[in-house]
Regions:
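Proteins enriched for Cys/Gly/acidic motifs involved in redox and nucleic-acid/cofactor modification
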Residues: 2-208
Length: 208
């Protein structure tokens, strides 16, 4: 496998690979139903999550799914930064100012984590899909517990389980398209509006 994979007591690491990304046009995609392993049920019981979303409507749609998964785990949404047990940044890589805002927020939450070492911080979406961004995140923000890209939202329960129970940091950014998962629970931000994906993925590799 071209992706660099490293796993020990503290970290699981799968980094983006341009070589693997070029295989997107020929790789087969499977469509599966989302399934929650019983061992993940109540993983977030009594805990709070904060979800910060940047970028396009596609990210908004993904964040609604992320919220659905987290609440399925027992987490409750909060806007109180000091109350949050899990903070996840769903990011955009097209505009430089959006990336700079994320870096600024990561630095700010680093201070919160010093006061609350049990706070879990994660970053997902388009920024981690960039090779240079992963290097920057690992160097500047070692306090981040979870990093994943655009293809593996369905794995959030597994990542949280590893951080909480196995004391691991997880970096898993897939370069090829992951499987498409249907019937992921969704928490809508508006009672009469919904973001609906009409396509998934891209056959190129971001070089913004």
């Amino acid at each position: 496998m071209a992706n660099k994979i490293k796993e020990n007591k503290y970290i699981k690491e799968v980094l983006p690979s341009l070589t693997d990304a070029r295989k997107r046009r020929t790789s087969e995609i499977s469509i599966k139903d989302f399934y929650l392993d019983p061992k993940y049920i109540n993983l977030g019981a009594g805990k709070y999550y904060m979800l910060k979303t940047y970028g396009c409507q596609g990210n908004l749609a993904d964040s609604e799914k992320i919220a659905g998964i987290l609440e399925m785990l027992g987490y409750t949404k909060t806007e109180d930064e000091l109350k949050a047990d899990f903070v996840l940044f769903n990011t955009c890589a097209i505009r430089e100012n959006a990336e700079e805002r994320v870096y600024g927020e990561l630095g700010r939450f680093q201070q919160f984590k010093k006061k609350n070492p049990d706070m879990i911080i994660g970053i997902c979406g388009c920024m981690p899909q960039e090779e240079k961004t992963i290097v920057s995140i690992k160097k500047k923000f070692p306090q981040i517990n979870i990093v994943f890209g655009t293809h593996n939202i369905s794995s959030i329960p597994e990542y949280l389980y590893d951080v909480i129970n196995n004391q691991k940091k997880v970096i898993e950014v897939l370069s090829v398209e992951g499987d498409i998962y249907e019937n992921i629970p969704v928490i809508r931000d508006h009672p009469k509006k919904a973001w609906v994906n009409i396509m998934y993925g891209c056959d190129e590799f971001c070089t913004y």
